[in-house]
A protein has these predicted regions:
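STAS-like cytosolic regulatory interaction modules
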Residues: 1-53, 64-108
């Protein structure tokens, strides 16, 4: 099982979480609480360029954070999605619901 490394960075009007490794039921505890706390205060960007695994539990965290963001007037952005993560998100049928960006300059 590959571990998930999470690097936090503050932007002007967002919190960036760079994710690297497997984002799954075993590793989501490393980031889920941080995402949920941050989304109440500011926009959140998940940099998923280096995500090597994404399972249903992790997608559930992303969807819940997306819904929380809408309720609080904030936005959750998915940045530079890896091929593996993209494949898994596409399989849910909800890809069009997410705010997918190529650069943090797109955060509005």
């Amino acid at each position: 099982m590959e571990l998930l490394t999470v690097t936090e960075k503050d932007g002007t009007d967002y919190k960036l979480y760079e994710l690297s490794g497997g984002f799954n039921a075993y590793t989501l505890v490393n980031v889920a609480g941080k995402i949920y706390d941050s989304i109440k205060k500011t926009n959140v960007v998940l940099d998923m360029a280096n995500v090597t695994e994404l399972d249903a539990a992790a997608i559930g965290v992303i969807m819940a954070a997306h819904n929380d963001a809408e309720e609080t007037g904030k936005k959750l952005y998915l940045l530079s999605i890896s091929n593996e993560a993209d494949r898994q998100i596409l399989a849910t049928g909800f890809k069009d619901e997410f705010n997918i960006i190529s650069s943090v300059t797109e955060v509005a």
